[in-house]
């Protein structure tokens, strides 16, 4: 996590890109962005996925109401089957139109993260990071949910043998009446 902030942009921005992932979540209002030269009108609950190198800019036209946006900068991560520091949407587009349930979850999470930045308590960074991980998992579930379910879920590598043993026991408890093989 590089940064998180809530902003009400009042002027148009300049074309720019980042060498890290920047997520821009629209809390309210409409946000007009030019991304790689193409215009996108983002609504509340939409997420701009600014992968490294993506050229984008915010534009505010005369008479338009300013949106409220939350910016989150991330680095030093790598999702399986994606380039480092990137979150690739299936259609290759830079904007994710969140479903109603995800929108509700993200609204709550980003508000909680913003509140956490203001309270200045010990462990603040780790709390925000934990919320960010939750946000990323929810995004991945919407983006790749159906496809990954067919592949038995996402791959989360763990070096903790205790975690693996607990998962095996939980699986056996849930499926004790079924035929269980090592292939499962």
Model-inferred region functions:
Residues 16-33:
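Short, conserved beta-strand element in jelly-roll/cupin
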Residues 18, 34, 42, 64-66, ...:
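A generic fold-level signal
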Residues 30-32, 39, 55:
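Structural motif
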Residues 26-28, 51, 175:
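A short, compositionally biased micro-patch
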Residues 1-10, 52-119, 136-151:
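A hydrophobic/aromatic-rich effector-binding and dimerization subdomain
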Residues 94-102, 117-128, 137-174, 178, ...:
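Short, Lys/Arg-enriched, Trp-marked, Pro/Gly-tolerant hinge/linker segments that flank
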Residues 37-52:
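Short acidic-glycine-tyrosine-enriched beta hairpin
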């Amino acid at each position: 996590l590089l940064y998180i902030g809530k902003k009400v942009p009042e002027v148009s921005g300049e074309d720019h890109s980042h060498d890290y992932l920047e997520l821009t979540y629209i809390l309210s209002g409409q946000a007009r962005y030019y991304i790689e030269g193409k215009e996108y009108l983002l609504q509340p609950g939409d997420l701009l996925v600014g992968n490294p190198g993506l050229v984008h800019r915010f534009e505010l036209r005369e008479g338009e109401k300013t949106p409220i946006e939350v910016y989150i900068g991330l680095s030093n991560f790598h999702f399986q089957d994606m380039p480092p520091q990137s979150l690739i949407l299936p259609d290759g587009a830079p904007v994710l139109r969140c479903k109603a349930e995800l929108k509700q979850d993200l609204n709550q999470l980003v508000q909680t993260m913003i509140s956490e930045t203001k309270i200045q308590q010990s462990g603040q960074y780790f709390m925000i990071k934990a919320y960010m991980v939750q946000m990323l998992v929810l995004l991945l579930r919407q983006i790749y949910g159906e496809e990954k379910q067919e592949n038995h879920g996402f791959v989360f590598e763990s070096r903790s043998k205790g975690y693996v043993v607990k998962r095996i026991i939980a699986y056996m408890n849930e499926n004790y009446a079924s035929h269980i093989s090592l292939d499962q």
